[in-house]
Amino acid sequence: MTGSHPSGTPRGGSNPASGPAHLIVSFANTLILEPEETDLLRTREEAAGWLHTAALLPAEAGLSNSEHAALLRLRASIRDVLTAHTEGREDPGAAARLTRALADGRLVITVGPASTVRLASAARASYPSLVADVAVAVADSAAAGSWLRLKSCAAPRCGRAFYDSASSGTRCPAHPA
């Protein structure tokens, strides 16, 4: 399964993993809790700027109030699921919220002339397309085996998303000890 998503790191992201996991980590890390809280998606304009940099939203596109609110819910639901990964537990509520948020992507399977198969958004609007890119990143990271290794730091006031490459437990790059 392949998807189309950016490989660059916009502001607020780190590159602990590559490909689809990188997009998820970068998006989750648009909310930074320490040393002081910084929300890179705080306003519609700031969110659009970050999304433009991440190549998730066309340069001429913006976000409506309802799309901005949905974007914040999408990020929160991803962060909740990553927290569950960190704690090694299932969280049916977080999984259901993420499922609802990703449904805005309206994914379909497309088949190209050479029988190449990919997931894409059935919508032509910018917001559903960016959600589809995030949904494809989740699906691709699950297929690659990296989805459950995406976690959030358990340290108080950190919450940084990261790819856990430690073989003996969770290690946030900001709190390696």
Residue ranges and their predicted role:
Residues 1-152, 156-163:
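Short helix-coil boundary/hinge micro-motifs
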